[in-house]
A protein has these predicted regions:
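C-terminal motif of bacterial Sec signal peptides marking the signal peptidase cleavage site
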Residues: 16-19
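Buried hydrophobic packing residues in well-ordered domains
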Residues: 25-27, 32, 153
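Positively charged n-region of N-terminal signal peptides that target proteins for export
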Residues: 1-5
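Post-signal-peptide N-terminal segment of Sec-exported extracytoplasmic proteins
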Residues: 42-68
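Mature, soluble, non-transmembrane domains
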Residues: 72-212
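Bacterial signal peptide processing site
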Residues: 21-23
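Post-signal peptide N-terminal segment of mature Sec-exported envelope proteins
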Residues: 29-45
Length: 212
């Protein structure tokens, strides 16, 4: 799972300069299996402004480059008029004994459910905010951009019917509260990208969801 998060974090470094990034992660449960979906895309407008070829990032990208992902994972390019990126899909039996697959599964303990958040695993993300700024104004500007960009986690109500609260665990019980929105068949968790730069304060490799 470390390899896939490294790939995604490479793309999201662009957030140091623009908020033209979209990250979506979802989990559903159908026919006795968890179905996982991940998508990360960049705006083609960004590359047009930089006079760069957006498809160059994804050229030669395939499942082998991902490393630790389930063998049944499918990887598809995303290439529309507005964005370019990749999406990943795979199903996992909740009774699997495969360690790679188990790393992606939600874990339920009483009223708590732990949702793996692969984007929060990579250490380089913490270095992508404010590290290249030479003054307080530059750092504040970078943080403002990061705060406007959000990662979304969609959790099917077939997995968790109702959510009371969601958060990242913090030191000294100072947790980071994550907003939850009702999307009909799903609950949506919106995570500002800026919080991923605060790894010393929060455990960001998983989201704690409290069920009602």
């Amino acid at each position: 799972m470390r390899k896939i998060s490294s790939f995604i974090s490479l793309l999201l470094i662009c957030l140091a300069f623009t908020s033209c990034v979209d990250y979506v992660q979802s989990v559903t449960f159908k026919n006795g299996k968890y179905h996982m979906y991940y998508k990360v895309t960049l705006s083609k407008l960004l590359f047009a402004m930089m006079d760069e070829d957006p498809e160059e990032i994804f050229r030669g990208f395939d499942e082998e480059a991902l490393g630790e992902v389930p063998e049944n994972a499918s990887v598809s390019p995303v290439n529309t008029d507005l964005e370019v990126g990749a999406e990943f899909k795979f199903g996992i039996d909740p009774k699997t004994t495969d360690e790679t697959e188990k790393a992606f599964l939600p874990t339920i303990a009483g009223s708590k459910c732990y949702i793996p958040f692969i984007l929060g695993e990579n250490e380089s993300i913490a270095d992508s905010v404010g590290t290249d700024t030479d003054n307080d104004y530059g750092e504040a500007f970078a943080e403002a951009i990061m705060s406007s960009a959000k990662c979304r986690i969609l959790i099917s109500k077939g997995v968790i019917p109702s959510i009371e609260t969601a958060y990242f665990e913090g030191k000294g019980n100072q947790n980071y509260s994550i907003p939850v929105f009702d999307y009909g068949d799903d609950n949506c968790l919106e995570i500002p990208f800026i919080v991923l730069s605060q790894k010393g304060m929060y455990r960001t490799d998983r989201v704690v969801v409290i069920r009602k």
